[in-house]
């Protein structure tokens, strides 16, 4: 966990271009922290005053962009929970990486035979039930095999038994439109 100096920028739920200031920055945020676990959760927590200029605009499913640490580019998170504290006059905002939307997609049936993770990722993208504009990249050069049936793409990459992380090892890194396996 790392405290964030930059204030999150608020965007509408259906935004696709984040090269602007959206609805504005949550400059009055009292707390902003990104939590990222290796091959696991990637979430943003914000405490914002009810007197803040954007309080009335904040709702579930909206997007927040913030620099998650001192090294990575700003990342987009989707709000999934708002908890109002009427005594403190604040709202606690919880948001998860936008890439979690991939759990709503599915690989029906795909056998990966003696291939690299990059080839497996390319095949996975081709076999998704719904098209995606996410890119999947790996620099691991070893070959192995696995089989996926009715699994979402995030589970294929870093889930339990048979995932690429399980079969090849490595670590995932999430970008706004790219997931890397190193």
Residue ranges and their predicted role:
Residues 42, 75, 89-91, 177:
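Envelope-exposed proteins and targeting segments
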Residues 1-57, 96-102, 117:
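Juxtamembrane "anchor/assembly" segments of surface/extracellular structural proteins
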Residues 96-182:
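Charged- and aromatic-enriched interaction segments used to assemble
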Residues 32-37, 80-84, 171-173:
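Short, exposed beta-strand/loop patches in secreted or surface proteins that constitute
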Residues 56-58, 87-89, 103-105:
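Short acidic, gly/pro-rich beta-turn/loop elements at beta-sheet edges
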Residues 45, 81-98:
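Short, solvent-exposed secondary-structure boundary/capping segments
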Residues 8, 44-46, 64-66, 79, ...:
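Hydrophobic beta-strand residues in large extracellular and virion-surface proteins
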Residues 2-17, 49-85, 111-133, 162, ...:
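Short, acidic/charged, Gly/Pro-enriched secondary-structure junctions
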């Amino acid at each position: 966990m790392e405290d964030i100096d930059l204030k999150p920028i608020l965007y509408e739920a259906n935004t696709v271009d984040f090269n602007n200031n959206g609805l504005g920055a949550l400059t009055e945020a009292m707390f902003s922290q990104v939590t990222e676990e290796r091959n696991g959760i990637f979430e943003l927590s914000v405490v914002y005053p009810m007197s803040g200029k954007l309080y009335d605009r904040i709702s579930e499913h909206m997007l927040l962009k913030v620099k998650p640490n001192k090294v990575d580019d700003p990342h987009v998170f989707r709000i999934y929970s708002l908890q109002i504290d009427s005594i403190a006059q604040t709202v606690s905002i919880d948001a998860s990486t936008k890439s979690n939307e991939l759990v709503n997609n599915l690989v029906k049936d795909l056998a990966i035979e003696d291939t690299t993770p990059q080839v497996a990722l390319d095949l996975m993208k081709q076999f998704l039930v719904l098209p995606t504009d996410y890119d999947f990249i790996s620099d691991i050069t070893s070959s192995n095999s696995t089989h996926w049936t009715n699994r979402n793409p995030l589970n294929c990459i870093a889930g339990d038994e048979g995932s690429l992380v399980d079969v090849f090892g490595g670590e995932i890194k999430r970008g706004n439109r790219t997931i890397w396996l190193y």
